[in-house]
Amino acid sequence: MLNTFGDTFRVTTWGESHGKALGAVIDGCPSNLPLTENDIQYELNRRRPGYSLFSTPRKEEDEVEILSGIFEGKTTGTPISCIVYNKSQQSKDYTAIKDTPRPGHADLSYQLKYGNYDYRGGGRSSGRTTIGNVIGGAIAKKLIEYTHKIKVIGYTTEIGTIKGDFNYYNNPEFFESDLNIQKLSNQIEDSVLRCPSTNSNEMNEYVFKAIDGKDSVGGVVEVVIYGLPKGIGNPIFNKLEGRLSSAVMSINSIKGFEVGKGFESSRLFGSEMNDEFYFKNGIICPKTNNAGGILGGISTGAPVVIRASIKPTPSISKTQETVNIKTLETVPIKIGGRHDPIIVPRVIPVIESMVSITIADLMISSGFINPSKLSNI
């Protein structure tokens, strides 16, 4: 089982949903980066359960403790180790279904591959393990913003069959200045679904309807990388979009990924899809950004635009059919415990984290960030 992501900026995550604790070890972060537990806690608070209208009732504070790698408020270049203790497990909720793999979950595939599987809350396959992703992502996000003022911002564009009216292509002006991006960030965080669209209330009603029907819903998240320099990524087998898709698709519940116009580009003429170039203050710029900031696997300097589709939460209160792996019989199953009717808004900081880790990794390996130490900026 591979638990480490990255080449030069490496994040190793560990822990299970109902274990004693979870955490991450970050290796390859340069020294001299100002970093506190508050930097990490802010991102963990955005991901944590039990504190929003559509979140699981399982309340966890998810308080992070930095164990190593920081001295006098700055990174030392040594591994940064962080831990978060679980405090609200209810493992008894899973005893009755330990031999009956839950539809839509990784129970069966983990059992078949590893045999000894921690069934409590999904164990290592649980979405709760993304705490480690967010710890690493918080540090990566701080690094790329501190050194190059790069911002990674995600938001909901669709919930179920309801499409929002806000996206990068409808509202490019929001990504033209730091001030506009801050305004957008405030709008996103003020929304229970992290959706800046004017019809987000319609999405809320859609989720309520699913809850009433003992069901769950999914959605689509768009992420924009603002301020990424030209020249990040490599052609052929190490393309920027390939690295980003690998990072995002590693997250539980992600079932689709696209860049720029994505699948819509297959329905356009070349004359509609191509981004023409012009000079702006002596710099070559695209008139449009249908490519999503990437050409030939390399960043163009325009905002990088990606989207990910998130499946409905597999734990639902409806009775379903499964099998008992001990008796070899088909049996009904009804999932108890505490679960999210929708995980889209909580997945957004996880996607931002994996994107930030990828960008930090590439910025270091491409020579944009000194791998040893940062100068006083």
Curated annotation (Swiss-Prot):
<keyword id="KW-0028">Amino-acid biosynthesis</keyword>
<dbReference type="InterPro" id="IPR035904">
    <property type="entry name" value="Chorismate_synth_AroC_sf"/>
</dbReference>
<feature type="binding site">
    <location>
        <position position="338"/>
    </location>
    <ligand>
        <name>FMN</name>
    </ligand>
</feature>
<feature type="binding site">
    <location>
        <begin position="252"/>
        <end position="253"/>
    </location>
    <ligand>
        <name>FMN</name>
    </ligand>
</feature>
<dbReference type="InterPro" id="IPR020541">
    <property type="entry name" value="Chorismate_synthase_CS"/>
</dbReference>
<feature type="binding site">
    <location>
        <begin position="124"/>
        <end position="126"/>
    </location>
    <ligand>
        <name>FMN</name>
    </ligand>
</feature>
<feature type="binding site">
    <location>
        <position position="296"/>
    </location>
    <ligand>
        <name>FMN</name>
    </ligand>
</feature>
<dbReference type="GO" id="GO:0009423">
    <property type="term" value="P:chorismate biosynthetic process"/>
</dbReference>
<keyword id="KW-0274">FAD</keyword>
<keyword id="KW-0288">FMN</keyword>
<keyword id="KW-0456">Lyase</keyword>
<comment type="pathway">
    <text>Metabolic intermediate biosynthesis; chorismate biosynthesis; chorismate from D-erythrose 4-phosphate and phosphoenolpyruvate: step 7/7.</text>
</comment>
<dbReference type="GO" id="GO:0008652">
    <property type="term" value="P:amino acid biosynthetic process"/>
</dbReference>
<dbReference type="InterPro" id="IPR000453">
    <property type="entry name" value="Chorismate_synth"/>
</dbReference>
<feature type="binding site">
    <location>
        <begin position="311"/>
        <end position="315"/>
    </location>
    <ligand>
        <name>FMN</name>
    </ligand>
</feature>
<dbReference type="GO" id="GO:0004107">
    <property type="term" value="F:chorismate synthase activity"/>
</dbReference>
<protein>
    <recommendedName>
        <fullName>Chorismate synthase</fullName>
        <ecNumber>4.2.3.5</ecNumber>
    </recommendedName>
</protein>
<feature type="binding site">
    <location>
        <position position="47"/>
    </location>
    <ligand>
        <name>NADP(+)</name>
    </ligand>
</feature>
<dbReference type="GO" id="GO:0009073">
    <property type="term" value="P:aromatic amino acid family biosynthetic process"/>
</dbReference>
<comment type="similarity">
    <text>Belongs to the chorismate synthase family.</text>
</comment>
<dbReference type="GO" id="GO:0010181">
    <property type="term" value="F:FMN binding"/>
</dbReference>
<keyword id="KW-0285">Flavoprotein</keyword>
<keyword id="KW-0521">NADP</keyword>
<keyword id="KW-0057">Aromatic amino acid biosynthesis</keyword>
<dbReference type="GO" id="GO:0005829">
    <property type="term" value="C:cytosol"/>
</dbReference>
<dbReference type="Pfam" id="PF01264">
    <property type="entry name" value="Chorismate_synt"/>
</dbReference>
<comment type="function">
    <text>This reaction introduces a second double bond into the aromatic ring system.</text>
</comment>
